[in-house]
């Protein structure tokens, strides 16, 4: 089953209907047909928005219907310059209790595109857009003359909080 694919059929707005509610209704119909779940009780935000939560220290989840993604970053042995990046898709159980078929683990080869993983649907190319940034980010982090990282006040506040929490664990302020 595909995670998500763009549908070519046009969405028609009813008189007085907003584009947002029309897209949410469209998603409810598409996902009902592909997952056998009645999504009528879900809000428009749950059907459209890309809500993201990061769980300390390396786990990001999008608890939404349209993008049921989970990212997990893990150490790659003892190499601080590399890591393992996992992407999971978590689909809901059908209304009759039938569970989605479990996916087989697939490991990309070096330089293999995420877009080549058909199960990711339209999300493979989205991940591919972000991956080329990682080596430049890593290189920039290592190149600082002041040997520290300057973080933005708002956009990178979660990174700052993550490292402050790590420092507290290392200092023994939090139980392990």
Each model region followed by its residue ranges:
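C-terminal catalytic domain of Rieske-type non-heme iron oxygenases
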Residues: 1-176
């Amino acid at each position: 089953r595909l995670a998500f694919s763009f549908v070519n059929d046009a969405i028609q707005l009813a008189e007085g209907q907003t584009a947002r509610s029309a897209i949410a209704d469209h998603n409810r119909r598409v996902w009902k047909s592909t997952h056998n779940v009645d999504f009528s009780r879900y809000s428009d935000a749950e059907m459209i928005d890309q809500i993201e939560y990061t769980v300390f220290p390396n786990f990001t989840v999008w608890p939404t219907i349209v993008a049921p993604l989970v990212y997990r970053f893990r150490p790659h042995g003892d190499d601080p310059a590399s890591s393992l990046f996992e992407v999971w898709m978590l689909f809901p159980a059908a209304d009759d209790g039938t569970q989605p078929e479990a996916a087989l683990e697939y490991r990309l080869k070096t330089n293999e595109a995420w877009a080549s993983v058909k199960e990711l649907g339209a999300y493979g190319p989205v991940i591919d857009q972000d991956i080329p940034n990682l080596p430049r980010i890593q290189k920039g982090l290592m190149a600082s003359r002041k040997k520290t990282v300057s973080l933005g006040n708002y956009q990178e506040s979660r990174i700052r909080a993550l490292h402050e929490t790590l420092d507290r664990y290392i200092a023994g302020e939090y139980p392990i």
